[in-house]
Amino acid sequence: MVKRYGELYLEARRALRASEGENASFVARELLGFASGKSAAALMADRELYASEQTAERMEQYTARALQGEPLAYILGKWSFYGLELTVTPDVLIPRDDTMAVTELAIGKLREMEAPQRVLDLCTGSGCIGLAIAHQIETARVTLADLSQPALRIARKNIADLKMIGRVNALQADVREPAPKFWGQFDLIVSNPPYVTAQEMTELDVSVRAHEPEMALDGGEDGLDFYRAILQNFTPALRTGGWICFEFGFR
């Protein structure tokens, strides 16, 4: 049955209300935009027009995925962070607004340093922190590092998509191992490491537990395993007067 854009939106919003609450309108609008290839403004203008069968089928599929708990960012394959549109997949954590705090802290510290500022983003995932830094501070030279090769593929795609090749690079590194090749190279290290405790891992919302990468969440028994490892193994990577900036959880 052929339906209008407005009908597709309202049906999805109703279906999503129980799981998404007040966010149902936003999710339904984003899904319809993705299914149709139209902007929010175009959908509003075209709400009385009939959508194609292909658009209606895609909308049904995307809504079903959302109802099963799949995060919106993974359905869309992209997410916005610090004004940048980033590719995201289940290989990386979804960038969250909370992470803007450590990003802003790092940017503030780097503005006080002489150019070119050398930055290492550990446990980088999608690269969101390091890429935001590079976007805000053009003189910064940023290295994105992660143990996960699938995550590094996403980070490298984001580097290329944002046209930051030459200022940002990505490489594999295990923060649990000493890294003498990095010693004395960086003015600032920034990291949003895994910090969920063993107990909290069992209590995570299904949308996180079933879809986001466990290795990017699990911080060990007390949630501090990666902080200890980074401080032990990567403090020597700092130049004199350098900084380490961490995101951490509250409990």
Please give the residue ranges for each predicted region.
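Non-catalytic accessory regions of SAM-dependent methyltransferases
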Residues: 1-43, 48-51
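Residue-level signal for inorganic ion chemistry
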Residues: 31, 69, 99, 129, ...
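Conserved AdoMet
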Residues: 32-109
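Active-site beta-alpha loop architecture of Rossmann-like, nucleotide-cofactor-dependent enzymes
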Residues: 73, 196-199, 251
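Conserved SAM/SAH cofactor-binding pocket of Class I
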Residues: 100-203
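Class I S-adenosylmethionine-dependent transferase superfamily signal
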Residues: 106, 133, 208, 230-234
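Mobile active-site "lid"/loop adjacent to the S-adenosyl-L-methionine
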Residues: 195-226
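Conserved Class I SAM-dependent methyltransferase catalytic core
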Residues: 221-251
